[in-house]
């Protein structure tokens, strides 16, 4: 967004641009500049997202990709501003796009168990009596990354900076409810529910975010619950709820609904999807599956409201090194907070594993409200001498509140990764710098970013070690080939692991030398290319790049543990040159396999390409063809027959990647067609959430874009019976037997269609296609047409689990060996090939053993 030219310069607030009453533009010399530091432009990361109009500070650390925005500030930025955090660097938790709401159009409806329902405009709201006070907001997931390093929760990785403090201005909720004539609990008014705009989010019956308070909390004058419209004395920004939001001091941020649209007084708590499926701390033994199976989400005792006690160290920060050339004063710093209005009374540091504790100095910025409640964090400091760290292995921090509660020593995992408040524990590592001076490096548990020296947090390192040990243990029980020796990692000059910059990694992007980055570590996957189950291209697609998101989206913990044997060093931002030396430019490794670039081919195995949706074709209740436009009518996909593509999306804050085979090929110019069966939420008891990516496709509107990457896959049908495996092994088949289950038909269909299209292709083809019902059969008309047009070359057989049709002439029930023998080719030699795609259990327990009994070797079976 371009900031309009102003006579006196300055940045106009986005609230004013959306019609809020005038407030003067901000300039660096304005007295309010420091408590706002407004972003001047739209960040390039937000271009091509629904938030492409929201101005954001580029310093924020984005935790869930580009969209939606979930971010926290770096610790040094958070602490730099002191007690009051500028909104531009205040942490943000968004479940979706920030809605663009004009001031004049917004209304707040107050209804339910009230005598006088209200329908307030913003002008009417701000005309009511208001209060202003400072309040610390905290996401319940603050410090979640530490939990995720023990065991993955269902939440993304918050670091220790999901907390911020600002002044809030608004109308007391109690006053509004009294104005509306709220009924009493005796009359059924037990809860006050809040929700944001309808249709804002993909989950829930109305697509809104909502939650509730008890009547007692909402009406308690000591709780200072307000309907806020200003932050640090200026109108709210879009990310913080403009034009209006809830502020509930002492509560977790997840209860403070942004873009507030409706307040409803009810007899029962909010029935909103997010009220139940978010912000809970379940017992440690309850995982996601058990929570769904046994209804743990709906048990009221596990809801989170009040914040717990928590604290963190800001100095020394992660990867900081304190030189020990002299015994010098050093000031440690950090923050602490508590919930429920409780006062922080102690911040303590231990340098001897908790045997003794040193009391820090507390800087308290607020006075309590008239009821004695404290709503803000404190900052603490502790003066030590640098030699005090010399015999310490760890720094421990804990805080106490006025009820004499403190933080637990040990972390407790829960499925949502929420409310982690164990001791803040920093490891201390001795090291010698390039000048030969002894120093100590501090390693925090799980910071969002790598440190300035390229190191990850110690809990992350522990996690990698645990995965490697699990892999070794699993390998030992397999009693297979002798174990390979542990990897030898070349040492850097300082004795640590070899360090590489991203430029050096990028030079290794070929089959001859294939490196990639995962979680700040560098891996050489070259030896594994031929062994990868998905073929070499599945790795080469990320060669020379950071593969963290793509790897995590589709790999299990077992696969992650296998990384250890290919580890070669750590990723660093840059490497200092030796005195008088120059850093040579990395030289790319020569490749003999790089294809020439065709300007009319869309897919690029090295980069994601973004394509717009141009048409939706509804086939039945849950099946669609999504047609995406290519850059011109002359462009083609560039997808060899048998290969597939990856699609990418950020869904509810999670980076999701799925493999699909388009049903259009290179012969259909100007478009890419995806056949998608939508797995809706709450339809199958075993999968109550439905399919993430298929529901994302369902939410697309014409003009929306999807990112694609490819081609990839280990099998290519070259035509006339010839095929290639892993880009190297060229073979020929005279008979091809296909087995497909459900949506697994798409790669099979691509090969069958290509073979039958060529009149010179004499390959004999059979297909057994398994589905649940007749209505579930995808591409039925297309397959029937191919079978009718090529009866001498293509035999088609269906089986369904159930049917009500008296005209059904095919099988009923699961696939059987007898069915395979009747409708597929027995293996009579090396030119017979079996190709399959479907549910893993069907392939593993039925297809593979049946085909083996028909003479097929594992080498003659292709798994798409």
Swiss-Prot record:
Entry's Gene Ontology molecular function annotations: FAD binding; heme binding; molybdenum ion binding; molybdopterin cofactor binding; nitrate reductase (NADH) activity; nitrate reductase (NADPH) activity; sulfite oxidase activity
Ranges of residues in domain Cytochrome b5 heme-binding: 497-572
Keywords (A to Z) from UniProt: Disulfide bond, FAD, Flavoprotein, Heme, Iron, Metal-binding, Molybdenum, NAD, Nitrate assimilation, Oxidoreductase
Record-listed FAD binding positions: 658-661, 675-680, 687, 692-694, 746
Keyword Flavoprotein: yes
Pfam families xref list: Cyt-b5 (PF00173), FAD_binding_6 (PF00970), Mo-co_dimer (PF03404), NAD_binding_1 (PF00175), Oxidored_molyb (PF00174)
The keyword NAD appears for this protein: yes
Function, as annotated: Nitrate reductase is a key enzyme involved in the first step of nitrate assimilation in plants, fungi and bacteria.
Cofactor: FAD; heme; Mo-molybdopterin
UniProt xrefs under Gene3D superfamilies: 2.60.40.650, Cytochrome b5-like heme/steroid binding domain (3.10.120.10), Nucleotide-binding domain of ferredoxin-NADP reductase (FNR) module (3.40.50.80), Oxidoreductase, molybdopterin-binding domain (3.90.420.10), Translation factors (2.40.30.10)
SMART domains on file: Cyt-b5 (SM01117)
Catalysed reaction equations from the record: nitrite + NAD(+) + H2O = nitrate + NADH + H(+)
Residue stretches making up the FAD-binding FR-type domain: 606-718
Gene name for this UniProt entry: NITA
Transmembrane feature ranges: none
Residues that coordinate or bind Mo-molybdopterin: 139
Record note on cofactor: Binds 1 FAD per subunit.
Binding-site residues for heme, renumbered to this chain: 532, 555
Name of the featured protein: Nitrate reductase [NADH]
Entry's EC annotation: 1.7.1.1
InterPro entries, per database record: Cbr1-like_FAD-bd_dom, Cyt_B5-like_heme/steroid-bd, Cyt_B5-like_heme/steroid_sf, Cyt_B5_heme-BS, FAD-bd_FR_type, Flavoprot_Pyr_Nucl_cyt_Rdtase, FNR_nucleotide-bd, Ig_E-set
GO BP, sorted A to Z: nitrate assimilation; nitric oxide biosynthetic process; sulfur compound metabolic process
Regulation: induction: By nitrate.
Family (UniProt): Belongs to the nitrate reductase family.
Assembly description: Homodimer.
